[in-house]
Amino acid sequence: MWATHGLAVALALSVLPASRALRQGDCEVCISYLGRFYQDLKDRDVTFSPASIEKELIKFCREARGKENRLCYYIGATEDAATKIINEVSKPLSHHIPVEKICEKLKKKDSQICELKYDKQIDLSTVDLKKLRVKELKKILDDWGETCKGCAEKSDYIRKINELMPKYAPKAASSRTDL
């Protein structure tokens, strides 16, 4: 009898998560972005009240691109956001709660927040552009805020990237030998 109760308890404990703490690599976009935001607030000596933090976060999110913009959307800091959980960021941040803890709470509200991961950056100084897919070449241009109108073939995208590289990635452009 005791063995079955012990087995049931062991089974129940194994099913429940041992800790709700974030693992390494979890919420990387959330932690990074909110960390930069918090540091920006401290550097500019902004008043740490929930209302002022909320206003500043909305302003900060206007400049966000890519995954960071998606995070802003999830917390309700963009104009087109469906839900508003921005107070789940502004209130704890006003009490100087670490961003890791804030992201942990946000994960409980919306698990998508912690599923965001930064895209791997391509090292333009060493990569052979000819071996990349057209999709990856388009992404490089998109990350720079550029488009390639009239590009039909891979070689057109490579030419455009090589043309713009000194402007957007000067270190990579100077270290490349195939130009």
Swiss-Prot record:
Residues 1-21 form the signal peptide. Residues 93-155 are annotated as: Interacts with ERN1, EIF2AK3 and ATF6. The keyword Disulfide bond applies. Selectively promotes the survival of dopaminergic neurons of the ventral mid-brain. Modulates GABAergic transmission to the dopaminergic neurons of the substantia nigra. Enhances spontaneous, as well as evoked, GABAergic inhibitory postsynaptic currents in dopaminergic neurons. Inhibits cell proliferation and endoplasmic reticulum (ER) stress-induced cell death. Retained in the ER/sarcoplasmic reticulum (SR) through association with the endoplasmic reticulum chaperone protein HSPA5 under normal conditions. The N-terminal region may be responsible for neurotrophic activity while the C-terminal region may play a role in the ER stress response. Interacts directly (via SAP domain) with HSPA5/BiP; the interaction inhibits ATP binding to HSPA5/BiP and subsequent nucleotide exchange. Component of a complex containing at least CRELD2, MANF, MATN3 and PDIA4. Interacts (via C-terminus) with ERN1 (via luminal domain); the interaction is decreased in the presence of increasing concentrations of Ca(2+). This is Mesencephalic astrocyte-derived neurotrophic factor.
